[in-house]
Amino acid sequence: MKAFPKSDVPQKATKAVSLAPNVTSVIELDLNRYLTPPKSWIVPLIRPKNPVEHSAKIYDFNSLLSLQNTKLDFDDVEEDRVAAYFHTGGTTGMPKVAQHTYSGMIYNGWLGHELLFTEEDNVICPLPLFHVFACHVILMAMVSSGAHVVFPTPQGYRGDGVFDNFWKLIERWQITFVITVPTAISALMQRPVDADISSVKTSFSGSAPLPLELFRRFEEASGVTIVEGYGLTEATCLVSCNPVEGEKKVGSVGLKFPYTDIKIIKSEKGNLVECKTDEVGEICISNPGVYAGNTYTEADKNADLYYKKKYLRTGDLGRKDSDEYLWITGRAKDLIIRGGHNIDPAIVEEALLGHEAIAFAGAIGQPDQHSGELPCVYVELVGGATVTPEELDQFCKENVKEPGALPKHIEILEELPKTAVGKVFKPDLRMRAIKRVFSETLDSSGVNASITSVDDDKKLGLVANISSNEDDDTINQILGDFTIPWQRASN
């Protein structure tokens, strides 16, 4: 993108190219051509500078496009093949690139057309087009169904004025279907519904678990029912969804889509076996969006990624109930999901391990009422070393290159919990973080309640046990925006 007001994407791209000497060409797109006067007159006057720090040749996208033939001048290939590459979060500290086929993309668009949208629908999608849901589901479904889509800004929800004008945008474009994520719902609930949104029929939420209390607040404020779904970049996108028309189970991510199969597996005596109803295990999926055997561009990253050679092992933990509804209870992989965005804990851990006083570091996602999870890190010091959390916080600001990965809480422990082979045992750290965050939240509310423990429940996943004389509604008002469930502590 050519330098543009209120965007640092061009500057980041220039810096990236300067660090990649093998890049010889850059294709640049100028957003100003899509503006109308007087804005199109103003942009050239206030366009920020973007000094070129590389030797790559820069081409204008539209100039190149005008030189091309308007019809195919080669024989089109009829067989299926890779059509797109999308980066996805990983646990190794190195980016993974997922391969998406034409059939997988068409499948996602077909689902949107057949099950969600018609040519009468107006959809608002405040997700950026580098998000698989925006690109493969919404864009493809619009082409397939003839529905109309509104993308408020290139940055999605993060663009200026999106939240403050969201309800008015719905009224202006007579939106019937809202695409959202839990973080955005939380932000919208801090703003009054200041427009006529009676045109909205349904709202879809994905990317991260949706707290029950947030679900209820949105429904009460807007009169719109939220439909929760599940998908992932490695599967091109869609996996399951609560029925738009039919029984919706709040907290569940619904039923599998047509031509999708879901298995829940566990390891038993060294073998992978399928779980029984309501038994928690790893979620494995097979559908046209799964490029079995070739999910990632690097072959070694596809090793041990499949069950029975066709089911993608997602790394997510979940269960299927007696009605075949899918419930996600946790993650076998360690990714921190902040507002629907994946953060690799290795980014924080590797930075801190560069500090001379740090022997071990374990980064996790601690519960947050707005973002779902926020980065949190526990460290163990080298024998005899001394350092303060404040000093480590400053060290992170200087060495953690991804702003969203900066830890919101740093705690020094005498010794980190470890496995038998010496690896940091993160489930204990997650329980510790849940107890601390929930305790702080209860204390600040002034209610008579305390967290006695945090357990790993076979059906619910991690759950906080609370001792209190307060009624359930009072506790729900305080803790309901967290995705971690709570229950009364047994006597």
Q: How should these model regions be labeled?
A:
Residues 28, 39, 47-87, 94, ...:
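Conserved pre-ATP/AMP-binding loop-to-beta segment of ANL
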Residues 106-125, 130-176, 191:
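Conserved AMP-binding/adenylation subdomain of ANL enzymes
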Residues 1-63, 485-490:
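Structural core segment of the AMP-binding/adenylate-forming
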Residues 83-107:
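Conserved AMP-binding A3 loop
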Residues 1-8, 171, 178, 287, ...:
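AMP-binding/adenylate-forming catalytic core of the ANL superfamily
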Residues 152, 180, 202-203, 210-229, ...:
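Conserved AMP-binding/adenylate-forming
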Residues 4-16, 29-35, 127, 153-156, ...:
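Adenylate-forming
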